[in-house]
Amino acid sequence: MMAGDMKPGKKVVVSEFAEDPLQAIDAHMSLQDMARPDPATLKAGEVLIAIQSASVGWVDLLMTSGQYQHMPKPPYTPGLEYSGLVAAVGAAVNPASVAVGDRVLVDGLQVGPRSLGDYQSQGGFASYAVVPDTAVHRIPSTLSFDQACCLLGNYETAYHCLIARGRLKAGETVLIHGASGSTGLAAVHLAKLVGATVIATGRSDDKLALVKAHGADHVINTRAPDGATGVRRFRDEVKLLTGGRGVEVVYDGVGGDISLESLRCVAFGARFLIVGWASTPAVAQGRGQRGAPNANVLPTNLIMMKGLDVLGCPMVIATVNDPTIRPPRFAQIMQWAADGRITPHVSHVYPLSEFKTAMRAKWNGEGS
């Protein structure tokens, strides 16, 4: 798209924090008109993006109610990760790095709701965005726009957790919870890349079939029997699959009862990776009030007796605290993508006008 081809567009706006994401979707988010961008207003190092695709992530949902640890200031446009075409560039942008017409993905750690500073309000649920050239990266030819906007957040999280923190290596077995979600599938991909055996869990046979098709060696449905609460006992299956030894690594993005049962599935000295708590999304109060009324708790007796390393894995916070950890991680992920060794899974595609349907689908676990 050239600058002269641009027309007025649309953007989604979160007007204020809600009590929970569903309330935000229903009452505090709207699709608003967006003026035709004027390339003449770009600063020297800025890039104008004609957005083609934006992913809907779990974090996007939690941010709308102020229940994520980082809270953008409303009003803002959601959409942590997005991709598009370069429509115009500022006078100081190096054409060797990015040029008009390039297919690019935008770094959600530098711009958009998860960032700090001048570009925080400009998320990807919009027709256009203006970003600094340092936040723009050419999309590998192996990926579509839809796939590209599902790359960095998912695979950087999985890399930080499994490889940097978990020290997963060839020959080990990893138990991956929430494997049918976008970050869980990325974890399956990376675990197989390093040569590990993957036991993946989920609550839907259909979704677990997809996880198996993406490389998991074994899958376990943890849904409790009809009429029962929590999760069903799966320690015996894991022990059987590991010759009675248990797994060396647990990748836990679910929390709650899954975490407790997983403590019975580990080998002595295993690494237990805390990635998230999808089973208890209201771990913080709504409307940005903080607090932890539903905090997950792990029994310290089992942690001690099994000699576990319990590791918190906040990819973004760790990167902010030590930016040097990111360049090698970023380069490796981009190289794997360019080589066709990792390909993000896209389960659903919606037009921007159906953003509420897309966000409800994510909340209800209807897609990856």
Region spans (language model):
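Hydrophobic/small residue at the entry helix of a nucleotide-binding pocket
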Residues: 157, 182-183, 257-258
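NAD(P)H dinucleotide-binding glycine-rich loop of Rossmann-like/cofactor-binding domains
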Residues: 106-178
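N-terminal Rossmann NAD(P)H-binding glycine-rich loop of SDR-like oxidoreductase domains
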Residues: 180, 188
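C-terminal hydrophobic helical "lid"/dimerization subdomain
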Residues: 1-7, 321-368
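Short, well-ordered loop/turn sites that connect or cap secondary structure elements
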Residues: 97-99, 168, 266
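Adenosine-nucleotide cofactor-binding segment
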Residues: 176, 192-261
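Glycine-rich phosphate-binding loop and adjacent beta-alpha segment
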Residues: 194, 257-342
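Glycine-rich beta-strand-centered segment in the early N-terminal region that forms part
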Residues: 37-56, 67-113, 140-143, 253
